[in-house]
Amino acid sequence: MASYYYLVATLPTLRLDGPLSFSTETFLTLCKTQVSERHYHLLCKALSGEKASHPFLKAYQHFETMVNKELVEQRSRKLSLSDPAYRNDADKEGRISDTVRQALAQENVLEAELLLLTLHWKFLDELATLHTFDIEALLSFALKLKLLQRKSLFTREEGNAEFKRLFSNIQTEIANN
């Protein structure tokens, strides 16, 4: 089992309510020369969302699937869609159902997204418990960095710009009909 004491010690502490320290690309560049080739490819798979056989990634990907299926089921129920394809017959977890329910009840889409990001963050914390200087610690860091990168896209300016663009498109469509 490889240990990456120096690399992990040089990484900044990530906090969900903190800033994005650097991009996932910068992280991969940093890792390229300091981890084994096999572990580097594993980190790439983690960040791309590609299926992997590593137990840590399998557990996280299974968790993501459970969250996504719960989102589909609860959204379809909210829209009164009864197609069996929307039903979640897979594994379920109470905290996932509760968080998804809370997120879908939010009027503010940003708050809903932050609830879901927090759910993922906490799960990564659980998975990485007792992993400090190994590949699991780096995988957790990479996936948290990816979550922070996603969160950094939620800016007021970009949100307002997107709203104006959509509103303008609707106005144009109404004017043309």
Please place each PLM-identified region on the residue numbering.
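Extended alpha-helical surfaces
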Residues: 1-177
